[in-house]
A protein has these predicted regions:
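Hot-dog-fold acyl-thioester-processing enzymes
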Residues: 2-58, 114-135
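HotDog/MaoC-like acyl-thioester-processing domains
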Residues: 3-7, 68-71, 82-135
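Residue-level signal for functionally critical sites in structured catalytic/ligand-binding pockets
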Residues: 12-17, 21-24, 28-36, 64, ...
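Hydrophobic beta-strand-centered segment that forms part of the acyl-chain substrate-binding groove
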Residues: 38-88, 102-103, 110
Length: 135
């Protein structure tokens, strides 16, 4: 069992809606940033995977909003790889402010041949790198 990946961010003014809360779509942006940073820590570079012939796309995204974030809030996005399938990876994500979960969700990525090809198995190098973040 691995440890979750944690990435810290701060709400910027342009991410808020007229109610002074983070606009809902921005939580998916936060999820994407955290997964990109996990990738950087685990593999060094997303481009290295693409250069070796594999890419990935989001096939499914889900967010549950619990309490709004507001301008200038510091928060963490916590990522756990909850499932590594043959051609897909599911991540569980939590947005935490001061240790309290304010939003949670899942992302399912499907691995494809680089350049827009069809589904392909998760490369062994990627699988091994992600195991330390797997629940």
């Amino acid at each position: 069992m691995g440890e979750p990946f944690r990435h810290s961010l701060r709400v910027r003014y342009n991410e808020c809606d007229p109610q002074n809360a983070v606009f809902n779509a921005n939580y998916l942006m936060y999820f994407d940033i955290a997964v990109s940073e996990l990738w950087r820590e685990a593999l060094g570079s997303y481009d290295s995977m693409v250069d070796s012939g594999t890419d990935m796309v989001v096939a499914e995204a889900k967010v549950r909003y619990l309490t709004p974030l507001r301008f200038d809030d510091d928060f963490d996005v916590v990522v756990t790889v909850s499932k590594l399938g043959t051609t897909s990876m599911t991540s569980a994500l939590a947005v935490e402010r001061n240790g309290d979960v304010v939003a949670e969700g899942t992302l399912r990525h499907v691995f494809i041949e680089a350049g827009g090809g069809g589904k392909t198995p998760i490369p062994e190098r990627v699988r091994k790198a992600l195991e330390s973040y797997t629940a």
